[in-house]
């Protein structure tokens, strides 16, 4: 009897420890899911302890944890719970680690909560592996998929917002540094080199390149870099103008060496260079010597108007035989040829 009383007290202590552990688990689950009345009702059922147990024979019907009324789901299902049999009759202590715990699980799908008897997990056996229903696994998969979709959507929205902020920070128009004609440069356009800018400045269509805004330097360059760039461009521009003037002067001098095109060549050279050409003293000496040997120009012939002056006179060789015969017969001394080609005979006064 002493051993049986010890075994009964041991079982009571063990039952109380199991109840306290279940209460801790239920406190954790109730913090995540509100209104878990079903789980608390199961714990109340577990707390029911028989008033007196005089003996633990196999002949007397035993009231174990599995035989307690299960009012959690409205029906009693003793077949779903394993029976815990005492081993005090066999003469050895009971199993100190009985693996029996009933946890009612609530599955979250987004904002809705699904609960039911099929969602309950029962941990049975020494390994303690859970037996999860297929509906519970499908719900967990859908919940994970939903969370991943929400995370991806939030990440995309953050990227869009960052891109919009970057675009707003960029300036609307950037001005390319140029001391004579500042021009607009598009955001996606590559910077123009100095050689390309000079080629476009000397020849080409410059419409639409002059900006209407006041001139300003780019913010990317420092003060020292800006000064150096302006000095270099100004010196190179002056050098290019000097080379161009020198070439035009050489062309003008070559044109002036030809006597027939001297005057025309000088005019062309002056027109091209837009400034007076100053030839050297040697060229001036040669030009004066050539002018002395230049032949005088012939007077320009006037145009003959037939309506006013008539047909021009054609001079032919006089036929003396015909004239002598006319003088003999008519006795005229002189023949006057008019402009019309008619011949008139003039008689002498004494004849």
UniProtKB/Swiss-Prot annotation:
Tissue: Specific to testis, where it is expressed in spermatogonia.
Organism: Mus musculus (Mouse)
Positions with biased composition (Basic residues): 73-83
Coiled coil: none
Protein name as it appears in the record: Protein Tex24
Function: Nuclear factor which might have a role in spermatogenesis.
Chief place where the protein resides: nucleus
Protein's cellular compartments: Nucleus
Region Disordered, annotated ranges: 69-101, 117-144, 275-298
Any Gene Ontology CC annotation: nucleus
Alphabetized UniProt keyword annotations: Nucleus
Signal peptide location: none
Phylogenetic lineage: Eukaryota, Metazoa, Chordata, Craniata, Vertebrata
Biased composition (Basic and acidic residues): 275-285
């Amino acid at each position: 009897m002493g051993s049986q009383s010890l075994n009964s007290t041991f079982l009571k202590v063990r039952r109380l420890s199991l109840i306290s552990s279940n209460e801790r688990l239920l406190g954790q689950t109730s913090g995540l899911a509100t209104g878990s009345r079903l789980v608390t009702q199961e714990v109340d059922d577990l707390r029911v302890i028989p008033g007196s147990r005089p003996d633990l024979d196999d002949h007397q019907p035993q009231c174990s944890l599995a035989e307690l009324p299960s009012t959690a789901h409205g029906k009693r299902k003793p077949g779903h719970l394993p029976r815990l049999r005492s081993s005090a009759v066999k003469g050895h202590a009971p199993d100190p680690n009985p693996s029996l715990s009933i946890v009612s699980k609530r599955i979250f799908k987004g904002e809705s909560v699904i609960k039911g008897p099929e969602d309950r997990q029962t941990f049975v056996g020494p390994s303690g592996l859970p037996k999860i229903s297929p509906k519970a696994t499908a719900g967990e998969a859908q919940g994970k998929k939903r969370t991943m979709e929400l995370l991806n959507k939030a990440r995309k929205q953050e990227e869009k917002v960052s891109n919009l902020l970057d675009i707003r920070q960029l300036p609307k128009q950037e001005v390319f540094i140029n001391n004579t004609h500042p021009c607009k440069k598009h955001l996606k356009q590559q910077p123009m080199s100095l050689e390309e800018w000079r080629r476009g400045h000397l020849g080409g269509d410059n419409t639409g390149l002059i900006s209407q805004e006041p001139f300003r330097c780019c913010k990317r360059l420092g003060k020292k870099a800006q000064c150096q760039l302006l000095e270099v461009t100004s010196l190179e521009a002056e050098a290019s103008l000097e080379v161009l003037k020198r070439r035009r002067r050489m062309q003008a001098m070559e044109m002036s060496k030809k006597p027939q095109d001297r005057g025309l060549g000088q005019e062309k050279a002056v027109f091209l260079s837009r400034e007076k050409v100053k030839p050297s003293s040697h060229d001036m000496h040669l030009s004066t010597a050539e002018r002395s040997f230049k032949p005088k120009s012939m007077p320009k012939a006037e145009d003959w108007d037939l309506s006013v002056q008539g047909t021009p006179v054609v001079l032919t060789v006089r036929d003396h035989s015909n004239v002598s015969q006319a003088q003999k017969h008519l006795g005229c001394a002189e023949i006057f040829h008019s402009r019309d080609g008619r011949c008139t005979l003039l008689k002498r006064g004494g004849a």
